[in-house]
């Protein structure tokens, strides 16, 4: 283990160089207001009872996706989308595309496209009479995703 390759510090990816775009009803928006974002996928599974074993197995039966982020409170894109639903009953799923690339890292670029996105709730109005900046927490779900660009495998991974 003493001679095992180690990751170079510069290969850690800085999140400050990320890009995030949202496409709603054919309109693509640069969501530069987001300063924190995370998406995850969870495997749904069912218990499998097996005769002759004391343990219970698991069988994958599907998956679900969720996302969350924090943004500066200075855009109305999602509120307009939600208002359309409130007035018409039509909620159009949207796409969120996130790319990570740090020019100082040899990891390169990774892009994840989330499709079938919905928002769980929306802040409609907000103020704070203090001197703090306004922000908003966003969260929702997605039902599809793709990875059109992948990080390069770092030297020593194989």
Locations of regions flagged by a protein language model:
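Intrinsically disordered, low-complexity terminal/linker regions enriched in Pro/Ser/Gly
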Residues: 1-5, 149-158
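Solvent-exposed edge beta-strands and adjacent loop segments
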Residues: 2-79, 112, 116-139, 146-147
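Short, acidic/charged, Gly/Pro-enriched secondary-structure junctions
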Residues: 82-113
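Short intrinsically disordered coil segments
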Residues: 83-89, 133-135, 153-158
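Short, surface-exposed polybasic-and-hydrophobic patches located at secondary-structure transitions
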Residues: 141-144, 158
């Amino acid at each position: 283990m003493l001679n095992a390759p180690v990751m170079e510090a510069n290969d850690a990816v800085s999140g400050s160089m990320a890009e995030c775009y949202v496409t709603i009803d054919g309109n693509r928006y640069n969501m530069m207001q987001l300063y924190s974002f995370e998406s995850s996928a969870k495997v749904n599974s069912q218990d499998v009872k097996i005769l002759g074993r004391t343990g219970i197995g698991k069988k994958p039966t599907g998956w679900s996706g969720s996302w969350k982020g924090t943004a500066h409170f200075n855009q109305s894109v999602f509120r307009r989308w939600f208002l359309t639903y409130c007035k018409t009953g039509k909620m159009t799923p949207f796409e969120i595309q996130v790319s990570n690339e740090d020019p100082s890292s040899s990891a390169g670029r990774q892009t994840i496209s989330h499709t079938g996105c919905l928002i769980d709730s929306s802040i409609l109005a907000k103020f704070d009479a203090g001197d703090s900046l306004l922000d908003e927490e966003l969260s929702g779900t997605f039902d599809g995703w793709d990875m059109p660009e992948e990080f390069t495998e770092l030297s020593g991974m194989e």
